[in-house]
């Protein structure tokens, strides 16, 4: 096997935040300390007390 360099450990940026529910790294909502991706947020938002106004 050839040389392999593991990816650098990130300290900040989009790849650091992880969804608490599914582990996804893209489109994570950090506001209010949620740390949920937008798909998981849509599934559990009503149970958490968020309500649609429109």
Curated annotation (Swiss-Prot):
Any one annotated GO CC term: cytosolic small ribosomal subunit
Cofactor (UniProt): Zn(2+)
A Pfam family it matches: Ribosomal_S14
Coiled-coil annotated spans: none
GO biological process: cytoplasmic translation
Keywords: Metal-binding, Ribonucleoprotein, Ribosomal protein, RNA-binding, rRNA-binding, Zinc
PANTHER family per the UniProt record, alphabetical: 40S RIBOSOMAL PROTEIN S29
Subunit-structure text: Part of the 30S ribosomal subunit.
Described purpose of this protein according to its UniProt entry: Binds 16S rRNA, required for the assembly of 30S particles.
NCBIfam families: PRK05766.1
UniProt xrefs under HAMAP family: Ribosomal_uS14_2_A (MF_01364_A)
Name of the protein in question: Small ribosomal subunit protein uS14
Organism: Sulfurisphaera tokodaii (strain DSM 16993 / JCM 10545 / NBRC 100140 / 7) (Sulfolobus tokodaii)
